[in-house]
Amino acid sequence: MVVVDSFAAGVVLHELRFDWLRGVRLAVLRLDLVDPELSGNKWFKLSHHLAAAHAAQAPGLISLGGAHSNHLHALAAAGQRFGLATVGLLRGTEQDTPTVRDLQRFGMRLHWLGYGGYRARHQPQFWDAWRALYPNYHCVPEGGGGLAGASGCVTLVAQIRARLGEIGWDDYEALWLAVGTGTTLAGLVIGEAGNHPVIGALAGPPAHAVPDNVRRLLDEAGRADAGYRLVDASRGGFGRFDGELARFILQAERD
């Protein structure tokens, strides 16, 4: 089983320099360079789930997501690479998207749950039928979440610290990240252990259950519910953007 450190070797800390950042030093942890198919935070969130499946000699992995799910994409790729069958429980009705085609190419078996069926994922007995259909498969929460997902992200703090010297830094003031479910943020808070604040920019409306999820993960990890804050960076819905944000992205890419 490939361990986290072998993937972390590809992590790069890249300092950005923009005119509008005069007086502020900003560096980005380039997790997109880790692996062509297991990139971003997805590998780190999956690493402990994969280790648990390996330890239990599970024949496969089963998880949930949408027709554009980066999580399911990484899970299917990991299953193919490490010899584990994969099953995806998808939101809505059957769709043909680039992500879905990749899932099929990686060998993932797909079940479309509709929207009502997908909402049932939070019910206590949701997994029972799927465990009966796929005995001994390791069930991975939506998005690679749970304490195992957060624990896999703890190592990111050490990766950042180990690379500060490469850009001439000896410390930093805070960690910022985009937040979907809060799993990665919880991992960073655990890893920081109060040394630096962690600020999460919400990709979805604040009404989503992110604060409750982070609080629960920190409780499970035995950590105080402190050392982080959330700011609303959403544009009316999960992952949406408006004209102002689109112009900013284009300008940043040009610069």
Where are these regions (language model features)?
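PLP-dependent amino-acid enzyme catalytic core
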Residues: 1-255
